[in-house]
Amino acid sequence: LNKIGGSSAKTKFKKLRFLFDFALAFHYLCMSLKNYMCQKPDMKQYAKHDGSAVTKDIRPQIKLCRKEEFENLWPQINDIFDKARQYMRRNGNNVQWTNGYPQKQTVASDVADGCFYLICLNGRIVACFCIRPSPEPTYAKIYNGQWPDDEPYNVIHRLASDGSVGGIALLAIRFALDKGNLRVDTHELNSTMISILEKEGFIRCGTIYVADGTPRIAFQKQGTRH
């Protein structure tokens, strides 16, 4: 009986030891895979125009547009504005960004004031936007609502993308939020921007009127430096 009992105990011990060793090996395997994934470069396969694949860095970089480079970069910036207008028209927004807005002199003023930014990917400009500090003259009066506070704020304007990279608008908005309290306005027909702002937690505050007299929906969110 003792032999039988001892044999049974040894068998159980061997099974427990096997399970322990297996669990330990599985743990180390998971840790190795985790470390491998964390060390992997943030890369993705993109398709060239000819259909072949090329590996490129997928992390867009935000940089301030410098005065000395603006003239050379303007054709690329203006092309992005054109593509943004085309996107608006295709999606039923025929009233925003008309008459060639944003004009070159407007953007040149943004650049001169050090508040115009470029979003670049692999050396190519894919989007642009402006962040200006308060006060914004057209925000002095708000209708059918009110601003949640009277604290200093920033305003994001002239946000445009060439459409080649997803999530660019959100990237720009979060970049602006890192600088503090942020107010944004957009047309009621700009469903894409409205959706982005609402998903990001912006409060719909009321209606403001821009310089040409047309209405815009006003939004605000407190940034991380508020």
What are these regions (language model features)?
Residues 178-189:
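Conserved GNAT acetyl-CoA-binding A-motif
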